[in-house]
């Protein structure tokens, strides 16, 4: 993966593959549902991870609420995005942005 241009969807795909390889099918299913929702939010356009911002995350949260997702679903999907984001930071694909998830519901 190109470190400078990795998309959220590519990173999700990598993490989902790792989860499946580890036999964590339920968790992989939740991550797949989260990336599907995020892709619908972006109208199936790739989202470079470097473009994640508090505004984008808040819009995603609002998108989910407008689709009548429960608060539990919203929180779960935001948590999966946060988890994938932190894995990308740990792998040095992107730089850490302090308080990126501060203004969204993440449980």
Annotated model-derived regions:
Residues 32:
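Glycine-rich, histidine-containing beta strand-loop boundary motifs that form or position
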Residues 13-26, 35-107:
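N-terminal core-binding DNA-recognition domain of tyrosine recombinases/integrases
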